[in-house]
Amino acid sequence: MLGLGLTITFTVDWEVRLRTWGGRFLNRLVGEVLENAGVRIPHNGAKPYTISPILDPGGRIVNRLVPGTTYWFRASFMCNMIDCDGVVGAFVRDSYRLGSGEVVRVLRVRAREFRPSLNGGSSSNNNRSIIEWGVEYYPTVFPFARHYITHPSPARFLTSATKTLAQLLRNTEVTLDGGGELYNAIINNIDTRGFVKDLVLNTEIVGFRVRRLRVGLGGGRVMPAFYGTAEYVTVTENISLFNALLNVAEFFGVGKNRALGLGFVRVTHRVVRNEDSAVETIRGPTALGN
């Protein structure tokens, strides 16, 4: 098993006001639940999990927990960095009691295994295909060259997803250099580094609606971020690996501070078209207007 996702539905016995970003509350909850169950997690370096924000049944982010109301969040774990069997045992229980005395009442825990499908590594007819796809972003920020990128950059999205896939397969076919960057990564005989470069060159954003915000992380720390939706178009011969990257992004998130609930995304659609037929459609009758 490469990855494990737990979707946890819960409620509380008394009101909890989240004075900072709710991902900090969830990060503390996940860490304490694991440690109380004897599941060891590293305190320095990359965390073996990512989490979503706290959401209501309609998928809206909340900053206040009210008794009698249900909420949910998702935590995704990398099984080469943590004992995923132990994770299941830690979270499948009636309640979680935090060191601060707060009690979270668990209503339901749903587990899902992550298995990227890389079979074949290319489209069935070896033709280049056009993929139209969309993403709904919850608060997200991409790091790049000591800057924070607060718009839905396709290059940052695809690079982040590729690095996560490499991290998932770190002890198998993927090789990383000492700095943790992708270096000649091979998945099923595919040059992943070259693939993502080609993918970035052949992906364009065709529309987006986003808003920027500043996320308070506590202790005076503030992180710039954005949220909203974006539409992209990609041309590739390797549909299988491209789909695997979208699946990784949706399962583990993208960007920075994912263990604090940032970078949670939902792939809204993906439509695959044959490049030849798409060109024929584009060459059809057109009309110009104001």
Residue positions per predicted region:
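RNA-interacting cores
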Residues: 1-290
